[in-house]
Amino acid sequence: ALVLGIRNFDPEIRLAGVILNNIASARHQTIIRQSIEEYTDIPVLGAIPRLKDNPIPERHLCLSLNKNDDKQIMLDSLAELIADNTDIQKILAAAGDMPRLPDPPLEITRKMQSSPLNIAYLYDDAFWFYYQENFDELKKLGVNLVPLSLLSEQSFAEQLQAHKLTAKNIDGLYIGGGYPELYAKEISRSPKLPQIKEWIEQNMPVYAECGGFMLLAKQLHFPEEKKYESYPMIGVFDIETKFFDKPQGLGYAEIKTIRENPYHPLGSIWKGHEFHFSTAVNAKPDQEFLFELKKGRGMTQKEMQNNNLAFDGLIYKNCFASYTHIFAPAVPHFSKNFIETARQYRKNQKENA
């Protein structure tokens, strides 16, 4: 029924075959395979057995850790498992028979090519939750993306030097999600935090999601050995984050922008998702949030007119933070507004030099 439903839902989609997963026994496989072959014309290309242990070590939300010293051994083991339980030649033949996807249009102007904007992004074992598509959207518009690490022994200056850049050449900063709680002690002691704070005070556009928001809050509270330890963060926003054992926000979010900011137009309605075991605490009673969530948890929930509403999003100068993750192709105003804010920042820096 599932295979028929997928095939018939959209006749324009070509379903070349299915691979069975989590198969408990040879009898289990035979029953499912015979049912598919009897009632559909879709070939079964393989059957992956149920495994005793998860082959990919994971933390919260089924995401693996970025730091995994055994990743090659793990990948080799998975490759062997797939090779032994699927018809690789039929899979390759089916894939090779598919039409080529059209190349996405490039929107790079001559001006952008001659002098690209440099947008840095934090990338290390603490911050690495990024959609590649978000990077692609920025690159399509001519942005040069520059990775920086908070956990590296190298200073930002040394890291930038490898790209023939200095701190003054950076036009924006993107801080994605990750596991900052696992490195809270190292982060709180990092000599690189003042540089981020300096960029923010200079009005640099900074866009932070989830873990990035935690970095920009005052403190991060994380349970260790049955008690909470508190770690000072950058403190851009007068708010703190606290971790719990169960998810505090998980799933899709529907957002309405209720206050002006450089990234999401006032009144715009868009979608994102939440992925966090922490929540915002100790916010000021008069704290103003940028978004009202029709669906989702956000940073806080308030009883208003007999309705329990959720709110998210903070802004300080050009520094933005929220729990909501975006998928840039579905929120087209994000990349364009981020770039326009970065371009204006570069212009102002040159005029004030």
Positions of the model-derived regions?
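Cysteine-nucleophile active-site neighborhood
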Residues: 179-262
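Hydrophobic, well-ordered secondary-structure elements that form the walls
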Residues: 173, 209, 234, 275, ...
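Phosphate-binding active sites in nucleotide-utilizing proteins
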Residues: 111, 115-201
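Short acidic, glycine/serine/threonine-rich loops at helix termini
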Residues: 1, 28-33, 56-63, 132-134, ...
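C-terminal and late-domain segments of enzyme folds
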Residues: 114, 127-137, 144, 243, ...
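Internal gly/pro-rich beta-alpha loop/helix module
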Residues: 1-111
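Short, solvent-exposed amphipathic alpha-helical segments in soluble enzyme
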Residues: 3-7, 34-37, 134-140, 190-191, ...
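NTP-binding/hydrolysis catalytic cores, primarily Walker-type P-loop NTPases
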Residues: 68-118, 315-353
